[in-house]
Amino acid sequence: MSSFEGKVAVITGAGSGIGRALALNLSEKRAKLALSDVDTDGLAKTVRLAQALGAQVKSDRLDVAEREAVLAHADAVVAHFGTVHQVYNNAGIAYNGNVDKSEFKDIERIIDVDFWGVVNGTKAFLPHVIASGDGHIVNISSLFGLIAVPGQSAYNAAKFAVRGFTEALRQEMLVARHPVKVTCVHPGGIKTAVARNATVADGEDQQTFAEFFDRRLALHSPEMAAKTIVNGVAKGQARVVVGLEAKAVDVLARIMGSSYQRLVAAGVAKFFPWAK
């Protein structure tokens, strides 16, 4: 079991949701925190809560899709703390829309934040994590990085890419014998603001999408998700699946292979009001 006391942990998307919950969980474990988000008000609240728990905190506004900004952030964090042990590439956004209704710019934005944001964070911090001698990269994928769902093609593409990138990175660290563990996280339905802040394709009803997600799919608290993730990191797990429904879907996809797609399509057509 890994210890978190005194470790420097970088968390993107720390202004709310899972990112904030991770920050507070690690604060209780006496980690030092480098927090970032595009939401400066939410980030400031997280900082206050973490400091109230006794954590040393550095915070910065950061759009993870902006590569040069992420590289500069990494330099600033190392200059401040002297090292980095753990990176939680958590920042992400959501989008709902079928391929034929989606604009290129909408798909590109999801890929830029949800995939390239993870790549940017990993690349920027990996040399420092290796140099720490006891490192860990934690990349947040999704339940939708395990199965594909109608209306989520762009999000699926990003989260499947995160999964492939992270699993390959883990193997590279093993082959090179670098002192770095790598974990890919697949949360199920978590009660965050992601759905409420999601963009949708033209003609789609954003409110219906958000309300349905919050009422039917958001089953777990961010605190529960953070606890599960941190426990998995402590154990050095390669994959952390958050929530019983996510674990069930993971098993279903493994058993059914590609035939799961017809089952999911039928379920979405029946129960998801925005998908038709």
Curated annotation (Swiss-Prot):
Classification of source organism: Bacteria, Bacillati, Actinomycetota, Actinomycetes, Mycobacteriales
Family annotation (InterPro entries): NAD(P)-bd_dom_sf, Sc_DH/Rdtase_CS, SDR_fam
Enzyme Commission (EC) number: 1.-.-.-
Active site, per annotation: Y155
Primary gene name: sadH
Role played: Required for maintaining the appropriate mycolic acid composition and permeability of the envelope on its exposure to acidic pH.
Molecular function terms, GO-annotated: oxidoreductase activity
Binding positions (substrate): S142
Family note: Belongs to the short-chain dehydrogenases/reductases (SDR) family.
Disruption outcome: Inactivation of the mymA operon causes altered cell wall structure, reduced contents and altered composition of mycolic acids along with the accumulation of saturated C24 and C26 fatty acids, and enhanced susceptibility to antibiotics, detergents and acidic pH. Also impairs ability to survive in macrophages.
Protein name: Putative oxidoreductase SadH
GO biological process: biological process involved in interaction with host; response to acidic pH
PROSITE patterns: ADH_SHORT (PS00061)
Pfam families the UniProt entry points to: adh_short
Induction section of the entry: Expression is controlled by VirS. Induced at acidic pH and in macrophages.
